[in-house]
From Swiss-Prot:
It is a multi-pass membrane protein. Residues 192-219 form a coiled coil. It is found in: Membrane. GO terms for cellular component: membrane. This is Protein ST7 homolog. Belongs to the ST7 family. The keyword Transmembrane helix applies. InterPro entries: ST7. It comes from Caenorhabditis briggsae. The chain crosses the membrane at residues 3-23, 49-69, 464-484.
């Protein structure tokens, strides 16, 4: 910081010296110094001069104070973190490490045939990338297949079906497996996902698959004590996983068709199975469904259970688990004070913030630091597309996965989007990637998950120090020119012509100096291609 302000003062002195040099003619500085002695000059000064001098010095001091405060406000936290890290790096390891670009399955993923394919037919654009669909195929193989399936024709066929690239081939292969075994639940799941035109049709096929897997589970002994995670038969565990997956998709069908109580009951029943609900991220579905029925107390309890919201632990110091958790907790805090921000003006900010409003703004800022791509979609600044089947935490894909399903919850609370807009406008100039570790490969990895026609959101960039210095000196130069044009309007045009003439002369002198030591044909020589001379 000291180097920056040293450079600032040196540049200021140089600027004043250059300005006095160019104004020596119009202001007749040399004639004044020759004709008037220092003693007589100071004796002839009036009290108005001292008043103007005092006011000018106060103005300059105020400008310097404002820029110092601006600099410390934007950079004090970063420099303090760097100093503390350099002092303690020998004794304490830095806990903030850059996370890997791990791909997470979207728990709110849509149905391919009933929703994604309808979008493709309407817009003639592919909503999913091959990389995203390939990851889904790998997930289905890990969930619906096991090593004991060898020798069972229908399951061996389904192993091939999940690997097929084209949707028609997967559907035909699944129908072949159903021809062998009409109770093949994994084949029915594939057909429900990719061979139905509406969500209601997908629900009917999934209910058929649920009956089939329940019939299969009823054949096992001691089924009443079988649960995921115990030491038991691998095939039984696989079938329990299929049953949980089908129940989750059936609850999602109920949610999409407006049967909210049925959907919430289904998600709650699934959340009691800790291992499977965590694997499939059922809590995200349950939180979204509770927000739809405006059961905010239940949402708060879920956040306490899954993310530690509102507890006295070190929740504010650790990184949030997801954008859904962080923005939902912020939404609950915003809801308590959103009435004060219903008007789009910033009068509520000017009158001073209460403790509840300050807490809401801190929660929004913390959520934006985790994933700054979400607010432009919630505020409808950026065009939204259909969410991918997988996302990367802190990436544009996660922002789409959250905003696509939660934007109506923000619109339902009057004043929530107004407060979000105010905090977002204040957040962008002060954004800091170092608050939470940010992988430099995140944006390139997001391109693999999002369609090529989508304009990917970039991480907000902080304004560089050089840019702030240039803006500062440009502002000061404009102020000086405005004062000169007001005080000496007759000499102002002559001064501008002299400055332009001096600039042209400096350019001509530099070109003459360059041409003296450089050959005349240096430009054609540099522009020409090297010619290979054949050996004799």
């Amino acid at each position: 910081m000291a180097c920056s302000w040293t450079f600032l003062w040196l540049l200021w002195i140089a600027m004043v010296a250059v300005l006095l040099f160019f104004l020596r003619g119009p202001l007749k500085i040399s004639e004044s110094l020759e004709s008037v002695s220092a003693t007589s000059y100071f004796n002839n000064l009036t009290p108005k001069f001292y008043v103007a001098l005092t006011g000018t010095s106060s103005l300059v001091s105020g400008i310097i104070l404002i820029f110092e405060w601006w600099y410390f406000k934007n950079n004090a936290g970063v420099e303090q973190g760097e100093d503390e890290g350099s002092d303690n790096e020998e004794s304490i390891d830095n806990p903030k490490t850059v996370p890997e670009c791990k791909v997470w399955r979207n728990p709110m993923a849509l149905f391919r045939a009933a929703e994604y394919n309808r979008f493709r037919k309407e817009t003639n654009s592919e909503p999913l990338t091959y990389y995203d669909m390939n990851l889904s195929a790998q997930d289905h193989q890990s969930l619906f297949m096991c090593d004991e399936d060898q020798g069972r024709a229908e399951y061996e066929i389904m192993q091939v079906a999940w690997r097929e690239r084209e949707s028609e081939q997967r559907i035909q292969t699944a129908r072949t497996a159903l021809a062998i075994n009409s109770e093949c639940a994994s084949a029915l799941v594939l057909l429900a996902e990719e061979d139905t035109e509406t969500v209601a049709q997908a629900e009917n096929v999934l209910r058929r698959a649920l009956r089939a897997i329940e019939n299969t589970l009823s054949t096992y002994s001691n089924n009443q004590i079988a649960s995921y995670g115990q030491n038991g038969d691998t095939v039984r565990k696989r079938d329990l996983t299929i049953q949980t997956y089908i129940k989750r998709r059936l609850a999602m069908c109920a949610r999409k068709q407006g049967r909210l109580r049925e959907a919430i009951k289904g998600f709650r029943d699934l959340s009691r199975e800790q291992s499977l609900s965590t694997l499939l991220s059922v809590q995200d579905n349950l939180i979204e469904a509770c927000l739809e029925v405006q059961a905010y107390a239940d949402v708060q309890n879920l956040l306490v259970r899954y993310d530690g919201y509102g507890t006295s632990c070190s929740y504010d110091q650790r990184e949030p688990r997801s954008a859904a958790m962080s923005y939902t907790s912020a939404l609950l805090k915003v809801r308590a004070v959103a009435e004060n921000f219903r008007c789009p003006s910033e009068s509520s900010v000017r009158r001073g913030l209460s403790s509840a409003e300050q807490t809401a703004i801190e929660a929004l800022t913390r959520a934006m630091e985790f994933n700054p791509h979400v607010p432009p979609y919630l505020l409808e600044i950026r065009a939204m597309i259909m969410p991918p089947e997988h996302f990367l935490k802190r990436g544009d894909s996660e922002a789409l996965a959250y905003a696509f399903f939660h934007i109506q919850h923000w619109k339902r609370i009057d004043g929530a989007l107004q407060l979000l807009s105010i905090v977002w406008k204040d957040f962008v100039p002060k954004v800091n990637k170092d608050t939470h570790a940010f992988s430099s490969q995140l944006e390139s990895a997001d391109k693999e998950l999002l369609p090529a026609w989508h304009e990917q959101s970039a991480f907000p960039q902080t304004e560089s120090t050089l840019g702030m210095l240039i803006q500062t000196f440009a502002c000061l130069a404009i102020c000086i020119l405005a004062v000169l044009s007001q005080q000496v309007p007759s000499s102002y045009g002559e001064m501008l012509r002299q400055i332009v003439t001096s600039g042209v002369q400096m350019y001509e002198n530099s070109m003459n100096t360059f041409s003296q030591w450089a050959p005349n044909n240096i430009i054609p020589y540099l522009a020409s291609k090297p010619v290979s001379v054949p050996e004799i």
